[in-house]
Structure formats: C-alpha cells, structure tokens
C-alpha cells in the first residue's frame, strides 16, 4: 500500500500520451476578464471578494481571472485552466455573492493538470487542494481539485514522467 508497482510502469503513461483524450472547453459566453483596463462599474464586488482572499492585480493577470454577471455562472469568479498548448481545459466558478452552492464548475472531466501552461516541471511543485490555495502558495503550486491524487490521474502521471520533486500542502 502506498507503493508503485513497477511492473505496471509502462501502462502508467498510456492515458497521458493519448491525444484523443485531450479536453478542451469554452469559457462561459458571459465571461468578463478582470485583466481588462476598461471594466464595467459593477466589478467592485468581484474585486472586493478577490481582495478578501489575498488576490491582487498581479495574481488576476497571471491566472487570467474573470467573472460572470449574467447567465448560468452569474455572480461567480471564473478561474480558467490552460493546457500546455494554451487551450482552456477546465475552469473553477466560485460564488462571490453568497450563493448557497459556492462552486458551480463546468460539466467536464476534472482529470487535468490545472494550468499546466504555467508549471515548470524542472522545479519542485507544491500540491494543494484548491485553486485559491494554489494562488496563495504562488510559484509552482498545482491544485489537485480535491483532497485525493490517484495513481492513474494525469497530474500523477505528469509528475512521474517529469520526475519532479513534490511538496504537499493539503488542508488538514
């Protein structure tokens, strides 16, 4: 238990190298980037929420954070994830107006490497549970989008393939 069976090592990377399984999704049509200089006046609540989480202009630009004021994701901060080619492969939608349901994420597979485009695999990575934890950790932090990392997950496979040192900073 807790050990990798080296007899199955070759199979470990099959999913990672399978281009058919590449996930690409669109951001909501109503997405408004908070990176823009000319923003609507009603962005105050979104900025106030991000500020309360310790997220400033630099993080907003780095993580390409936006929000929706209308539609299915209305009243939610949107934090997109980009794969190595720069395509959006997932996003987190977190309420900033007090919805009963804090997160309303897209109906897509969460087995991704969140924002792999920003990861330096030659440096140690810090695994955290959520995207806000990753933003707060800075540097080379990766959210596992939960509290479990499975051996067959794309993130585990990428870490093993790159032989990257890992630090874990999970909620406890």
Which residues fall in each region the model found?
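Phosphate-handling DNA/RNA-contact segment within nucleic-acid enzymes
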Residues: 63, 69-165
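Non-catalytic accessory segments of DNA primases and related replication-initiation nucleases
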Residues: 1-58, 62, 67, 72-76, ...
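Structural motif
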Residues: 169-172
């Amino acid at each position: 238990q807790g050990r990798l069976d080296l007899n199955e090592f070759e199979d470990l990377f099959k999913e990672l190298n399978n281009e058919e399984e590449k996930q690409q999704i669109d951001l909501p049509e109503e997405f408004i980037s908070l990176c823009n200089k000319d923003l609507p006046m009603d962005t105050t609540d979104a900025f106030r929420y991000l500020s309360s989480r310790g997220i400033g202009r630099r993080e907003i630009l780095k993580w390409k954070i936006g929000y929706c004021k209308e539609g299915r994701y209305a009243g939610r901060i949107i934090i997109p994830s980009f794969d190595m080619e720069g395509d959006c492969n997932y996003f987190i939608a977190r309420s900033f107006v007090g919805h009963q349901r804090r997160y309303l994420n897209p109906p897509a597979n969460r087995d991704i490497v969140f924002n792999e485009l920003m990861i330096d695999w030659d440096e140690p990575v810090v695994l955290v549970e959520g995207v806000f934890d990753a933003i707060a950790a800075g540097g080379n932090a990766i959210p596992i989008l939960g509290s479990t990392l499975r051996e067959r997950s794309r993130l585990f496979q990428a870490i093993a393939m790159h032989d990257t040192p890992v630090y874990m900073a999970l909620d406890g």
